[in-house]
């Protein structure tokens, strides 16, 4: 769920920032077959703009400018305007747009919202030292760089209930121009973040952890968070059933997040339950990810019993 027209990944990605958008996920909610369904709330165009633009990217609203934590040019191969840094007094408006989008998601019939503070999106930019060079109270120290993320999480939790809100983070994962290369600084940042998130009582913390160093940090964050932990193995390969079992065996995660395999296999759980990695899976078509029409969205076949 994109919180404003400025924050869409591109012109085809789903946005939900006005009452008229409540119907957007209605059909998907109707066909969820008893499962819980959540929307991911994040300023997506910032990631498309290479970790720079906080709300502009490929689709800017008429009369508005792309926004970011700082005025760094976009690295995306697509053509983008150079974003401008958000003024301190504008941050409350951006926070409130996350809240509005979350409310609309719940009114649409969804069960929850995941705040996207990973992969170079706007909230991740505030956390990363190379992206956040602000000189106000939202930049500088590790504690200050977590401030906006915590404010957004608290506001969304207050609006729709903390038990309906999760948050996704990707510590030390260089992506879309955001880098966290200093291990000590990264640990300090995410420990400060999770220490402030824990009292809010969020539904879960989702952490990208795909090697020994990141798993060690995930273990530390899990202990600090004190609630359900989701793990994800990253982008290097499509997650297999064996990968899921290995992540669970680490004893950190309550569940494992699966992306591409699930996109291509709407009945992935049933396939894995029946045959594990011996189950034949549809191959995901990356060209149809993140938007567009029915192709790659509703046309993957399910397993014939």
What are these regions (language model features)?
Residues 1, 11, 16, 23-305:
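Flavin-dependent oxidoreductase catalytic cores
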